[in-house]
C-alpha cells in the first residue's frame, strides 16, 4: 500500500482529531491513527472508544488499504517537515511503514487496521448543515461552563437543542449555568443531544 500526500495538509487534519487521543489508553491500538484509503481519498480517524473523530483528504494512490500508525511519532515527524509531498510505503505483511521525503526517510512499526475499534452505525440518522462560525461561536460561549466530573457525564458536555425557530446550547457544572441561543440557525426536524467536552476543546 503506497500513497503520496501533502505533509502540511496531513498535519492539519491530524491536529484536528488528535484531541480525542488519551495519554493512558486501556487498548494500545488507540494510541494510533487509523488510515483508510479508498480510491484517492484518505480517511484518518482517532478514538478513545467513547468518541471517534475522522477527517478526509485527497491523496495519490493506486490501491485501497487500511493501517494503524503511531499517533505521537507521526505528529512529531510531520512537525519537522516543510510543506511538500511525502510518500508512505506500507508493508501489508508486517505493517512496517516507510515515510519518504526530500529530507530523508523515517521508518515506523504500524499495526493492522482491522484491530482498530469499529465505529457503530447510527440508526435512523438525520443530518443538518450549519454554518461553522455559528457552531464555533456557540461552543466557545458555552463550553467553559461544562463540568469535568466523569461520574456525571451529563454535566461534562454541552447540551445542544435544534428547533424550527432556534439553536440552543446549554452547559453547567452545577455552580454556573450558561444558555446560548441563536435565532438565525434553524432545523426542520427538532432534535437534542449532548456533545462530550473532550473533542470540543
PLM regions: where:
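Structural preference for solvent-exposed beta-strand-turn elements
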Residues: 1-201
Amino acid at each position: 500500500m503506497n500513497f503520496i500526500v501533502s505533509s502540511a495538509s496531513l498535519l492539519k487534519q491530524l491536529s484536528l482529531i488528535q484531541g480525542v487521543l488519551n495519554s493512558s489508553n486501556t487498548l494500545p491500538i488507540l494510541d494510533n491513527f487509523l488510515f483508510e484509503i479508498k480510491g484517492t481519498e484518505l480517511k484518518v480517524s482517532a478514538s478513545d472508544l467513547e468518541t471517534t473523530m475522522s477527517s478526509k483528504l485527497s491523496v495519490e494512490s493506486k490501491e485501497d488499504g487500511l493501517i494503524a500508525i503511531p499517533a505521537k511519532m507521526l505528529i512529531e515527524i510531520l512537525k519537522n517537515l516543510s510543506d511538500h509531498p511525502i510518500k508512505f510505503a506500507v508493508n501489508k505483511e508486517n505493517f512496517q511503514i516507510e515515510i519518504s521525503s526530500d529530507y530523508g526517510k523515517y521508518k515506523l512499526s504500524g499495526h493492522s487496521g482491522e484491530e482498530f475499534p469499529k465505529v457503530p452505525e447510527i440508526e435512523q440518522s438525520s443530518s443538518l448543515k450549519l454554518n461553522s462560525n455559528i457552531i464555533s461561536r456557540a461552543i466557545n460561549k458555552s463550553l467553559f461552563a461544562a463540568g469535568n466530573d466523569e461520574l456525571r457525564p451529563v454535566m461534562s458536555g454541552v447540551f445542544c437543542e435544534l428547533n424550527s425557530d432556534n439553536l440552543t446550547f446549554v452547559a453547567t457544572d452545577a455552580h454556573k449555568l450558561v444558555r446560548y441561543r441563536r435565532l438565525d440557525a434553524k432545523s426542520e426536524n427538532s432534535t437534542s443531544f449532548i456533545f462530550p467536552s473532550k473533542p470540543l476543546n
